[in-house]
Each structure stands twice: as structure tokens, then as C-alpha cells.
Amino acid sequence: MGVKKEKGRKRFRKRKTYGNQILPLELLIEKNKREIINSAELMEEIYMKIDEKHTQCVTKYKKTR
């Protein structure tokens, strides 16, 4: 009978990464509605981001005119 060969550490397969996919703000809000509603800080952050987006859109619109 032969001697059993000791197996090395089993390596897991890496998951495929599709770059740094960032979910759109609206989707994130939909997914985490309960948490957001319960947390005033998160609500403030979201309103700030929406305001920033709005000001960016307005400035882009003015530049194209």
C-alpha cells in the first residue's frame, strides 16, 4: 500500500468582479428605505446628494444654453 499524499490548502475560486459597480442613488434608496427612514443622518446625507445632483444638472443646463 502506498502512503497517502497530504493535500495542500484548498483554494477557492475567485468570484467574477464587474468593476466597481455603483448602484444609482434611486436604487440604493429603494433597497434601504427602512434604514433610511429610521436614521436622520442618512436622510440628511441623501438630501445633500440630491441637492448636489440638482445643482450639477442646473449648471450643465446653463452651460449648454
Curated annotation (Swiss-Prot):
Keyword Transcription: yes
Keyword presence, Transcription regulation: yes
Keyword annotations from UniProtKB, A to Z: DNA-binding, Transcription, Transcription regulation
Molecular function per GO: DNA binding
Residue ranges the UniProt entry marks as DNA-binding: 11-31
Secretion signal span: none
Similarity section: To B.natto SenN.
Function text: Regulates the expression of extracellular-protein genes of Bacillus subtilis.
The protein's name in its UniProt record: Transcriptional regulatory protein SenS
Protein source organism: Bacillus subtilis (strain 168)
